[in-house]
């Protein structure tokens, strides 16, 4: 499916915690609408990651975090990348951003400059180089912890 259509894709979410022996795996859906709406719902809609314009809402384990990309530089870059992919536009250049291509995939890595008090140390989005369909989104935390979404 093209990422630019109002569409739903299946998603598998893997939460890896270094201190826990077994990864937590749940499934759900990814919904995308132009120009800049993304909703990843997993675990029976208990866990949500929503980008609605510049507003990001993340609900995990009953805790909700809300931020606005206009006030949070880490999410400003993430927002501009997602919006570009959804709308089939060039990925914006930036100091915190690297883009690589390999095997028909484009990998976009965002490493925030100011790592103090950030929820994540980096974001890694992999998309199909031709269709720009989302393939994976990995949000790396501290201590080798991460949350990874795999899209089908």
Where are these regions (language model features)?
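N-terminal leader/targeting segments and the immediate start of mature chains
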Residues: 1-29, 33-37, 45
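An acidic-aromatic
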Residues: 30-80, 147
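Extracytoplasmic
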Residues: 25-27, 35, 44, 53, ...
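A short, compositionally biased
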Residues: 6-8, 50-54, 131-134
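Flexible, processing/modification-adjacent segments and terminal tails
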Residues: 9-17, 23-24, 59-119
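Gly/Pro-enriched, hydrophobic low-complexity segments
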Residues: 99-152
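Short hydrophobic/aromatic-rich beta-strand segments that constitute the beta-sheet cores
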Residues: 13, 38-42, 56-59, 108-110, ...
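Short linear motifs in intrinsically disordered
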Residues: 29-31, 39, 45-50, 98, ...
């Amino acid at each position: 499916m093209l990422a630019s259509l109002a569409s739903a894709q299946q998603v598998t979410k893997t939460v890896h915690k270094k201190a826990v022996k077994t990864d937590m795996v749940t499934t759900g859906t990814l919904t995308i609408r132009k120009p800049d709406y993304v909703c990843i719902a997993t675990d029976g809609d208990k866990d949500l990651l929503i980008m609605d314009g510049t507003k990001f809402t993340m609900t995990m384990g009953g805790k909700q975090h809300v931020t606005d990309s206009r006030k949070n530089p880490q999410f400003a870059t993430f927002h501009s990348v997602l919006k570009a992919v959804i709308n089939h536009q060039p990925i914006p250049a930036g100091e915190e951003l690297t883009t690589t291509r390999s095997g028909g995939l484009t990998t976009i890595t965002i490493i925030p400059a100011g790592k103090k008090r950030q929820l994540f140390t980096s974001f890694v989005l992999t998309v199909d180089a031709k269709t720009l369909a989302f393939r994976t989104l990995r949000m790396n935390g501290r201590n080798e912890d991460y949350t990874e979404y795999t899209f089908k």
